[in-house]
């Protein structure tokens, strides 16, 4: 029995854009997490190696300053590279978010643990970390082999 007012099946206003945004957000978050894990793993291994060298030899800590700085920058480049590779798009942004997350973790550790904020020298280092990690993210996105060309 038809009364003239047939109800049409209403399509939801959402056409799948929210699912796409959620998937992209998961991808970015996953990339940042993998990048941070890589950074902290590399720094942990470096700390272990340097501490073993300091205890086993007569070397002093000051002789490792430049090596530790170079390895720190390399670690952040690798972390940005991994985060950009996992994120698959916008490597500069994912690299920047990875570096900012790293800097925030270090700042929180330093402030909550020691009651100190960043010095001017540390701030310059963390700005350098930001640039290097962004560069790593750009390379990470562009080195992925399974991208399709249009």
From Swiss-Prot:
Arranged from A to Z, the UniProt key words for this protein are: Cell membrane, Membrane, Transmembrane, Transmembrane helix
Q: Which Pfam families match?
A: DUF3792 (PF12670)
| Subcellular location field | Cell membrane
Per the database entry, which stretches of residues form a coiled coil?
none
InterPro entries annotated for this entry?
A: DUF3792_TM
**What topology does it adopt in the membrane?**
Multi-pass membrane protein
Q: Which GO terms describe its cellular component?
A: plasma membrane
Protein name (record) = Uncharacterized membrane protein YrzE
């Amino acid at each position: 029995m038809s009364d003239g007012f047939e109800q049409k099946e209403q399509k939801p206003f959402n056409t799948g854009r929210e699912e796409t945004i959620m998937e992209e957000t998961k991808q970015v978050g996953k990339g940042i997490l993998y990048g941070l894990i890589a950074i902290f793993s590399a720094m942990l291994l470096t700390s272990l190696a340097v501490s073993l060298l300091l205890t086993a030899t007569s070397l002093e800590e000051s002789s490792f300053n430049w090596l530790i700085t170079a390895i720190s920058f390399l670690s952040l480049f690798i972390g940005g590279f991994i985060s950009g590779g996992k994120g698959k798009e916008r490597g500069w942004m994912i690299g920047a978010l990875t570096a900012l997350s790293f800097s925030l973790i270090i700042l929180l550790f330093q402030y909550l643990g020691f009651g100190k904020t960043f010095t001017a020298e540390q701030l310059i280092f963390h700005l350098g970390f930001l640039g290097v990690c962004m560069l790593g993210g750009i390379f990470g996105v562009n080195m992925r082999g399974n991208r399709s060309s249009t």
